Amino acid sequence: MEEKYVPSAVEEKWQGYWAEHKSFKANEDPSRKKYYLLEMFPYPSGKIHMGHVRNYSIGDVIARFKRMQGYNVLHPMGWDAFGMPAENAAIQHKSHPAKWTYENIAYMRGQLKTLGLSYDWDRELATCDLDYYKWEQRIFLEMYKKGLAYKKSSAVNWCPKCETVLANEQVEDGCCWRCDSPVQQKELEQWSFRITNYAQELLDDTYKLTGWPERVLTMQRNWIGRSTGCEIDFPLESGLGKIKVFTTRQDTLFGATFMSLAAEHPMALDLAGDAQKAEVAAFIDKVKKTDRIKRGAEDLEKEGVFTGSYCINPVTNTKMPIYLANFVLMDYGTGAVMAVPTHDQRDFEFAKKYNLPLKVVIQPEGETLDPATMTEAYTAEGIMVNSGRFDGMGNADAKEAIADFLEKEGIGKKTVNFRLRDWGISRQRYWGNPIPVINCDLCGVVAVPEADLPVVLPMDAEFTGEGGNPLARVDSFTTCTCPQCGETARRETDTMDTFVQSSWYFLRYCSPKFSAGPLDREKVEAWMPVDQYIGGIEHAVLHLLYARFFTKVLRDLGYCNVDEPFSNLLTQGMVIKDGAKMSKSKGNVVDPNALIERYGADTARLFSLFAAPPEKDLDWSDQGVDGSYRFLNRVWRLVYDVLPVIGDAGAVNPGELGAEAKKLRRAVHKTIKKVSEDVEERFHFNTAIAAVMELVNAIQAFSAKDAPENVAVVREAVESVVRLLAPFVPNFAEELWFQLGHASVLEAAGWPGYDAAAVVDEEVTVVIQVNGKLRSKLTVAPDAKEEEVRAQALADDKIKPYLEGKDVKKVVYVPGKLVSIVVA
């Protein structure tokens, strides 16, 4: 064994061994319990960063731990490879997105391999591979046939910098989630997936996901946003139609005094009288340019315009002026709000500003509200007033009664509404999966026949950064023949949102080379669902919601038998340096390559796992990295020093051990127990590593390492350290295991079990309190009888002075921990 630890030599040796022997190749094996471990796959941006190192190290610990426990582990890796950055890089470097992407994949694959991550590289996939995206086109066509994919004109979020559409979930504080540019509203024909068909199931199944963080589930439930209420028809005064309203507050219907419409409402301009036409048109234009998030904010300055038209309150028969209001959104309910200013604060502020009538219909029991003196809306529970036959009822009861009344009278109906909107997947970019449809002047939208798939991205597109979608300018791609009528037609030039590719990749990993369809159902059933998924919480209502939706769709299409893709979810924290998330713009990035070159991959892994629990943010510390490196050197030196002595040691005979040797063995088995629990039950890798560090200290402090009767205990202790470290620092541990004389690798050795008898302390320390204050301590046997411990405590020399002249009222014993004496 070399005296000095040389990380590069150790890592090169064992990474070569694992690659040569395909050590982490997963095969279906019904005789073993499966475990599917997956981290969210990366975008091939060019280089891995410390966030990647941490995320993938966390996953690798779990994968290696499960293998050592005997599980059949699937741990794949791939690349979320379509997307705008590749196109932007092509413009900047005058190259092609494919070249940039595949070069980055090759480089980042090499980086990941240097970390010693236990991936089954035979299952590697990239979403830009034709062999991947062609099957996605097949899935699209099946969704189209089922009515789950459709095209329509609608107001969309438009990023002027990326020159593409964004889904609602991709707009953050009014800006593009990718480039941070202000988002505009634009009317476009676009393709969408009918995720709303699955809204109720997506909501219901969140209550089955017991292995997910509650925070993520709450975010999804809020995004889906189920609300129950009524749809109510308000006839136009002109008699030429009606306005349909969804409300959850039908109990306030008698207090509705005006109507508010979203600027995007299809009737908005039609309702404008000749005198109001110009003002209404200008208002519509202004509001459409305003960010939706700002329009929904409580502190928004309320603005509106009178259309010149009126509708009729169907229960009071009073005229209600119809306004357009900047705070009403078209994507909630029907885009029309019955305004009840006395019982809704936004309506109250609007009514005060535009001098609109107020009518109280709910008031506190025993009190009378005067609209003339109200300074804010009354939104609490109360008693119904000014509401006809419903007067005197509690408003909660009146909700149901009024809903029944509306249905009976044919004025409205009970209904359920969801905040969730269909997923717009059209993107006006080249580097994405082509949507497999053809636009024909005679036949309209025509699906590409399955026999003509795949629709392949042309490689001769030009990337100038101007003129929108490069794909639309490739005549050889866009010009085609209609498969129905045979006339010249135009191929769809929108590509799919990259979140489509990441919505089913975890299923494709089960059979990545399958050539007869998107998924091999038998293999999907063998591996799915993913047992542990790991990724950032920023994907709570993007990727994680879409992946759940897609899994349910593929189930209904017959491709799989699972309802939910991920049984357990871990959302890891960020890597922080100098008080901020690492980023190039902040100049606080640590290059993993430089770190690995100086300290080795295992030090990088150890620090990222030891510095904080996985779900918490990790504060970068150069001293912490040094400390991790020093610890590995200490363990290496320990093995080097004891190896000549323990080389031929046999099994431990607990009955022949002296007191100090028993103490060391107890520490060994307590550590095995703690590390096992910390890794398996809590993923508290930091405390697990700390426990191993304490064990190393105990071994080094054991003075009789050389004594013949102790060599077996020392060998057991040292080997336990190596086995416990194996998931965290695999290259390092594998080499020490080899040096300890083992012919097989650590996975074959398995995870160590602990001796239950060995972890029992021969003595425990019991503290003694008098009237709640610590006064002394006792050392007793762990199974000591209560009477004996109480007697010892009362007879303790340090306790006696506190008892003299006092009446002992109570003595309470908490076994193995505490004696509490109460005196007066």
Curated annotation (Swiss-Prot):
Q: What family does the database annotate?
A: Belongs to the class-I aminoacyl-tRNA synthetase family.
Q: Where in the cell is it found?
A: Cytoplasm
Q: Which reaction does it catalyse?
A: tRNA(Leu) + L-leucine + ATP = L-leucyl-tRNA(Leu) + AMP + diphosphate
Q: Where is this motif: 'HIGH' region?
A: 42-52
Name the Enzyme Commission number(s) assigned to this protein. Answer: 6.1.1.4
What is its EC class? ligase
The answer to whether keyword Cell membrane applies is no
The main place the protein resides is cytoplasm
Kindly give the Pfam families that the UniProt entry links to this protein: Anticodon_1, tRNA-synt_1, tRNA-synt_1_2, tRNA-synt_1g
> Binding residues for ATP, per the UniProt record?
584
The family database entries (NCBIfam families) matched by this protein are listed as:
leuS_bact
**Name of the protein this chain belongs to:** Leucine--tRNA ligase
One GO cellular component from the entry? cytosol
Keywords, alphabetical: Aminoacyl-tRNA synthetase, ATP-binding, Cytoplasm, Ligase, Nucleotide-binding, Protein biosynthesis
Key word Aminoacyl-tRNA synthetase present: yes
* Short motif ('KMSKS' region): ranges: 581-585
Classification via PROSITE patterns: AA_TRNA_LIGASE_I (PS00178)
